[in-house]
């Protein structure tokens, strides 16, 4: 981020993050494209710090929005809580293990041992993002076509499968995590509401890990630059808090929108949007 960053830029990025992070359309693709169009370097330390704050805002939006339904589903009684918590933690563990294995495979087999930060930069390539968006769009449309209003619940095998699918999304900028996990739930016969609740329960557990990863990236970048970066971060604190608040508010609106469209059988429209946006990304590449 540079001296040209102002509250308007922060507001725009916060709104994009709040909408795209919680709708199944890939926040990373939207935020990276917006940053590039505004002339900012997505890999700059200050942009990473802002992204951490925006992620924090959307995480709290998820907690606030789903708290009431989670109380009925996850905290109904102690036995129910233990079972649901086990499913969430197991799925997250599978995501973590498979994600690390996939990253190692990509790192050593395809890119000859480059650093994890360089791999993420490579996967920010516009053509790869467009391909990931198109794949996500097709997955969402197919799951919508196969959805017949089923009323299944999360079980151990489905939790494991969803966790594995979530891991496959991690390296690919443009492949929506929520889109993939909800679609997988629908493929497995899980009800729309249960698939949505489980997907965002996973998000609340996974997001702190993402935030820590971004902070590690920030520290890594700071060590490679001068002390001027520290001064820039200090000046960014208040604008970032401003952005966090708006990503929280926008996130609440996005979740309400998502729930309504999912419940009323309009899930496929997000897939159409992903396909259209992949074309936009390719055009602007």
Swiss-Prot record:
Q: What is its main location?
A: membrane
Family, according to the entry, reads as follows: Belongs to the UppP family.
Lineage top rank: taxon: Bacteria
Q: Which gene is the coding source of this polypeptide chain?
A: uppP2
What is the topology of this protein in the membrane according to its UniProt annotation?
Multi-pass membrane protein
Q: Which UniProt keywords apply?
A: Antibiotic resistance, Cell inner membrane, Cell membrane, Cell shape, Cell wall biogenesis/degradation, Hydrolase, Membrane, Peptidoglycan synthesis, Transmembrane, Transmembrane helix
Signal peptide (UniProt feature, chain positions): none
InterPro entries for this protein = UppP
* Family annotation (PANTHER family): UNDECAPRENYL-DIPHOSPHATASE
User: What Pfam families has UniProt attached to this entry?
Assistant: BacA (PF02673)
Give the species this sequence originates from: Acinetobacter baylyi (strain ATCC 33305 / BD413 / ADP1)
Q: What else is known?
A: Bacitracin is thought to be involved in the inhibition of peptidoglycan synthesis by sequestering undecaprenyl diphosphate, thereby reducing the pool of lipid carrier available.
Q: Which reaction does it catalyse?
A: di-trans,octa-cis-undecaprenyl diphosphate + H2O = di-trans,octa-cis-undecaprenyl phosphate + phosphate + H(+)
Q: Which GO terms describe its biological process?
A: cell wall organization; peptidoglycan biosynthetic process; regulation of cell shape; response to antibiotic
Protein task: Catalyzes the dephosphorylation of undecaprenyl diphosphate (UPP). Confers resistance to bacitracin.
Full protein name: Undecaprenyl-diphosphatase 2
